[in-house]
């Protein structure tokens, strides 16, 4: 299903659709946008509209999906030690934000910041919350860059010297779900990259 993660109806509908297939055991939140914008750019100050849009999708959308999924997970019987696992997606930009990433870094920093309190709140319901902070990954956002730019970015990752792949992300999700003691943590999935200021 497709939808606007900033709309609560979308979150409710997504959870209801998932429940038609059976209990909701895992939520992977990975919708996001990376709208560039400096605090003060060529066209003047960063607009509240741009900031609000990025925060609405990357942060509010994440929280909305978490809330709807957690409500469904709380109502179901545990499977092993868990009723469910919520995996959120932040970014290394939450830690190493570059010039021009004010809105994006703020939105992903908020996802990092809410991980522990959400895990603590949901612990009594046997629901775990873990966040992945990907580095330079092969994503639709990255696909919009020229090939030369993607190649240059791939050399910035120390090891392996490439862009992260969707399979790398999926493997970490699988590991998070299968490890019942992993909770309230943010895991960098970045090949040891640290973003430069520009």
Set out the residue ranges of the language-model regions.
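C-terminal substrate-recognition "lid" of short-chain dehydrogenase/reductases
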Residues: 165-189, 194
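Catalytic Tyr-x(3-8)-Lys segment
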Residues: 54-56, 148-168
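Residue(s) in the substrate-gating loop at a strand-loop-helix junction
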Residues: 91
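Conserved mid-core segment of classical short-chain dehydrogenase/reductases
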Residues: 12, 34-52, 71, 75-80, ...
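The beta1-alpha1 cofactor-binding region of Rossmann-like NAD(H)/NADP(H)-dependent oxidoreductases
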Residues: 2-13, 48
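Short, small/polar-rich loop/turn modules that mediate ligand/substrate recognition or access, typified
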Residues: 123, 128, 182-185
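Active-site helix of classical SDR
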Residues: 66, 107, 115
């Amino acid at each position: 299903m497709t939808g606007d993660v900033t709309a609560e109806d979308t979150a409710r509908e997504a959870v209801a659709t998932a429940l038609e297939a059976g209990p909701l055991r895992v939520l992977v939140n990975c919708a996001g946008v990376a709208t560039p914008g400096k605090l003060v750019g060529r066209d003047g100050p960063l607009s509240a509209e741009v900031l609000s849009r990025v925060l609405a999708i990357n942060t509010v959308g994440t929280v909305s999906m978490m809330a709807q999924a957690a409500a469904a997970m709380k109502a179901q019987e545990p499977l092993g030690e868990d009723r469910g696992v919520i995996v959120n997606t932040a970014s290394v930009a939450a830690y190493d934000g570059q010039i021009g990433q004010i809105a994006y870094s703020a939105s992903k920093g908020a996802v990092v910041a809410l991980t522990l309190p959400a895990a603590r709140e949901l612990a009594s319901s046997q629901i775990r919350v873990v966040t992945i902070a990907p580095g330079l990954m092969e994503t639709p956002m990255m696909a919009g860059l020229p090939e030369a730019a993607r190649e240059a970015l791939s050399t910035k990752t120390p090891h392996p010297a490439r862009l992260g792949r969707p399979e790398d992300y999926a493997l970490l999700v699988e590991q998070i779900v299968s490890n019942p003691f992993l909770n309230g943590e943010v895991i960098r999935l970045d090949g040891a990259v640290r973003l430069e200021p520009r």
